[in-house]
From Swiss-Prot:
Organism: Pelargonium hortorum
Protein name: NAD(P)H-quinone oxidoreductase subunit 3, chloroplastic
Membrane topology designation: Multi-pass membrane protein
Entry's Gene Ontology molecular function annotations: NADH dehydrogenase (ubiquinone) activity; quinone binding
Keywords: Chloroplast, Membrane, NAD, NADP, Plastid, Plastoquinone, Quinone, Thylakoid, Translocase, Transmembrane, Transmembrane helix, Transport
Length: 120
C-alpha cells in the first residue's frame, strides 16, 4: 500500500509557492499605471541620455571564450566531488574520470588548433 498522504504537505507547499509569484505578477499588472510613449522605449543608462546608438554588437570571440570557460567550469563541478571521495570509489571510477579528462584535453587541443583560442 502506498502512503500518498505523506506527500500532502509537499503538494500544499508546491501549490502555495506557485501561486505567490503568479499572484504578484497579476496584482502588479492590475495596479501598475499604464504609460506609453517614446520615453518607455528609450534605453536607460544610469539617468544619462544615451549618446549615439544604444545597440552594440559583440564579436563572436567573446562567446567562444565564454563557451570554453563554461566547459572547464563544468569539468571542475564534476571532478571536485570525485576528488573528495576518491578513496571510497575505487579504480573503476578513477579510470572513468581519467577518460573524462582525456576527452576534455582532446577537445581543448582541437579548439586550440582550429584557432578558437587566438585573439585577433
Amino acid at each position: 500500500m502506498f502512503l500518498l498522504y505523506e506527500y500532502d504537505l509537499f503538494w500544499v507547499f508546491l501549490i502555495i509557492s506557485s501561486l505567490i509569484p503568479i499572484l504578484a505578477f497579476l496584482i502588479s499588472g492590475v495596479l501598475a499605471p499604464i504609460s506609453e510613449g517614446p520615453e518607455k522605449l528609450s534605453s536607460y543608462e544610469s539617468g544619462i541620455e544615451p549618446m549615439g546608438d544604444a545597440w552594440l554588437q559583440f564579436r563572436i570571440r567573446y562567446y567562444i571564450f565564454a563557451l570554453v570557460f563554461v566547459v572547464f567550469d563544468v569539468e571542475t563541478v564534476f571532478l571536485y566531488p570525485w576528488a573528495m571521495s576518491f578513496d571510497v570509489l575505487g579504480v573503476s571510477v578513477f579510470i572513468e574520470a581519467l577518460v573524462f579528462v582525456l576527452i576534455l584535453i582532446v577537445g581543448s587541443v582541437y579548439a586550440w588548433r582550429k584557432g578558437a583560442l587566438e585573439w585577433s
